[in-house]
A protein has these predicted regions:
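Conserved helix-turn-beta segment immediately C-terminal to the redox Cys motif
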Residues: 18-20, 37-55, 61
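Structural micro-motif
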Residues: 61, 67-76, 94
């Protein structure tokens, strides 16, 4: 399942999660982001245990700034509220598995 993460639910869905959370910073006008969205949907369907959140940088500029997002798509894996891995650009399913391993 892919969650829509905002500044209002970030603490509950991400910081307080005991499971790793994969965050995708994206924008609707970004073509690589759209392709990444398709990859994430497929990944989520085949990995139902994975916690995945999408953050629209245009709607949540504070969160994008907090993570220092300069390019999109940008992916971050957080565990216990701390960034443990990150990647920039379109990622494959295998790369997503590697990020979450």
């Amino acid at each position: 399942m892919i969650l829509h993460i905002t500044s209002h639910n970030f603490s509950q869905e991400v910081e307080q999660s005991t499971e790793p959370v994969l965050l995708d910073f994206w924008a609707s006008w970004c073509m690589p982001c759209r392709r990444m969205g398709t990859v994430l949907e497929s990944f989520a369907a085949s990995h139902p245990q994975a916690r995945i959140g999408k953050i629209n940088v245009d709607e949540e500029p504070e969160l994008a700034a907090r993570f220092g997002v300069m390019s999109i798509p940008s992916l971050f894996v957080l565990h216990n509220g701390r960034v443990i891995r990150q990647a920039v650009g379109l990622q494959s399913t295998q790369q997503l598995e590697d990020l979450l391993s």
